[in-house]
From Swiss-Prot:
Binding site for substrate: 98-100, 126, 129-132, 139-141, 187, 319, 324-326
Other comment: There are 2 substrate-binding sites: the catalytic A site, and the non-catalytic B site that may play a role in the transfer of substrate or product between the active site and the solvent. Alternatively, the B site may bind allosteric effectors.
GO cellular component: cytoplasm
Superkingdom of the organism of origin: Bacteria
Gene Ontology molecular functions: fumarate hydratase activity
Gene behind this protein: fumC
The protein, known as: Fumarate hydratase class II
InterPro entries membership: Fum_hydII (IPR005677), Fumarase/histidase_N (IPR024083), Fumarase_C_C (IPR018951), Fumarate_lyase_CS (IPR020557), Fumarate_lyase_fam (IPR000362), Fumarate_lyase_N (IPR022761), L-Aspartase-like (IPR008948)
Site (Important for catalytic activity): 331
Gene3D superfamilies found in the cross-reference section: Fumarase/aspartase (C-terminal domain), Fumarase/aspartase (Central domain), Fumarase/aspartase (N-terminal domain)
Organism, scientific name: Salmonella typhi
Length: 467
């Protein structure tokens, strides 16, 4: 039989498992929202703990919270950040849209643990109150959006941006290494004029560089914190210096550029910062999907595809076809990019659906945002390590396809005109001739003229790959 204790909130008394630190409101949420399996992300829980830690420190400094209580709350928050109470935060994403129940989950856990630190007990006789002490100068309406921004910015800074930079560096190195390899270009999935493999990969590098700039451009808005706005943005029940000082405290303990939001009404009523930041992440997903698709097409084969590059062979690809190896890293990336694009739709809908002074789609928004960051960061790390770093050119195949391409005829445009060049290409294609044989047969130029004018290495321009 499970041992219980009695906890109380404004709705009355409720039984809670005696071995748990949470209280009445957490228990009610567990009983009322048994929906699916998605729980609040750990990084969001840690961001809530950071927020409570900063608030306790500032409330103490402002003379609003007794030093011993503040110290105990800070110690309890540090325990959460160290992962000591991970099973005390069981609530579902699918709860109140303001995140109130998760805010109270944190308040209750920290209050009960702080009470124990002070020599007290858990429950109704505890020495630290979840609302009056842990939640002092706060509302769920400003705490939860603050934690969202803290979790989002730290995830972008610590996980996504480093992996994006690493993948960009790998591809830049490949671009430089393959700068002298002339290959056929393709547009509309059809043969086009030549370029170098280095130039082709340099396009991927530039895509990722642009994406990094877009993501970095979104960070200042994410760094704006709602804390201090309390219920509707007016700052009711807060000290005049509280909002600025608590943002400064969060900036100090995270070494991140957090500031108090200049307009708390916007900070509470919208998710615009995360909508816009996720738009940049969606752009990255679009670029990664294109890059991964290009890689697997260029590596297709091994004998009946394009086969211009080789990628690492990491695992067997078929349960029935012996020896088959598939571009699995590319497939994983394209799948996760699809998920990111779906997340973007959900975040856009959530961001657009707030009413009046509060957006109430916040748990869903941050769940999808953090999932996107993790998918992209992990996906880029895996793709970089197990695919991109091992890309190698198949020079023999590249040369074969280059020499067989009819689009080399484009070099003749300035010598004999477009119409005659097109006639050469069509005759060569229809009769299975080389371009040279077709041109000579039509009498438009000699062998020597063809050799002098159709030189793929001179058709790639002076564009240098990478930066």
């Amino acid at each position: 039989m499970v041992t219980v204790r009695r906890e109380k909130d404004s709705m009355g008394v409720i039984e809670v498992p005696a071995d748990k630190l949470w209280g009445a409101q957490t228990q009610r949420s567990l009983e009322h929202f048994r929906i699916s399996t998605e729980k609040m992300p750990v990084s969001l829980i840690h961001a809530l703990a950071l927020t409570k830690r900063a608030a306790a420190k500032v409330n103490q400094d402002l003379g609003l919270l007794a030093a011993e209580k503040a110290s105990a709350i800070i110690e309890a928050a540090d325990e959460v950040l160290a992962g000591k109470h991970a099973d005390e935060f069981p609530l579902a994403i699918w709860q109140t849209g303001s995140g109130t129940q998760s805010n109270m989950n944190m308040n209750e856990v920290l209050a009960n643990r702080a009470s124990e630190i002070l020599g007290g007990v858990r429950g109704m006789e505890r020495k630290v109150h979840p609302n009056d002490d842990v939640n002092k100068s706060q509302s769920s309406n400003d705490v939860f959006p603050t934690a969202m921004h803290v979790a989002a910015l730290l995830a972008l800074r610590e996980h996504l941006i480093p992996q994006l930079s690493a993948l960009t560096d790998t591809l830049r190195d490949k671009s430089h290494a393959f700068a002298d390899i002339v290959k056929i270009g393709r547009t509309h999935l059809q043969d086009a004029t030549p370029l170098t493999l280095g130039q082709e990969i340099s396009g991927w590098v530039a895509m990722l560089e642009h994406n990094l700039r877009h993501i970095e451009h979104s960070l200042p808005h994410v760094a704006e914190l709602a804390l201090g706005g309390t219920a509707v943005g007016t700052g009711l029940n807060t000290h005049p210096e509280y909002a600025r000082r608590v943002a400064e405290e969060l900036a100090t303990i995270t070494a991140a550029p957090f500031v108090t939001a200049p307009n708390k009404f916007e900070a509470l009523a919208t998710c615009d910062a995360l909508v816009q930041a996720h738009g940049a992440l969606k752009g990255l997903a679009a670029s990664l999907m294109k890059i991964a698709n290009d890689v697997r097409w260029l590596a297709s084969g091994p004998r009946c595809g394009i086969g211009e590059i080789a990628i690492p062979e990491n695992e067997p690809g078929s349960s029935i076809m012996p020896g088959k190896v598939n571009p699995t890293q590319c497939e994983a990336v394209t799948m996760l990019c699809c998920q990111v694009m779906g997340n973007d739709v959900a975040i856009n809908m959530g961001g657009a659906s707030g009413n009046f002074e509060l957006n109430v789609y916040r748990p869903m928004v941050i769940h999808n945002f953090l999932q996107t960051v993790r998918l992209l960061a992990d996906g880029m790390a895996s793709f970089n390590q197990h695919c991109a770093s091992g890309i190698e050119p198949n020079r023999e195949r590249i040369t074969q396809l280059l020499n067989e391409s009819l689009m080399l005829v484009t070099a003749l445009n300035t010598h004999i005109g477009y119409d005659k060049a097109a006639e050469i290409a069509k005759k060569a294609h229809k009769e299975g001739l080389t371009l040279k044989a077709s041109a000579v047969a039509l009498g438009y130029l000699s062998d020597a003229e063809f050799d002098a004018w159709v030189r793929p290495e001179l058709m790639v321009g002076s564009m240098t790959p990478g930066r």
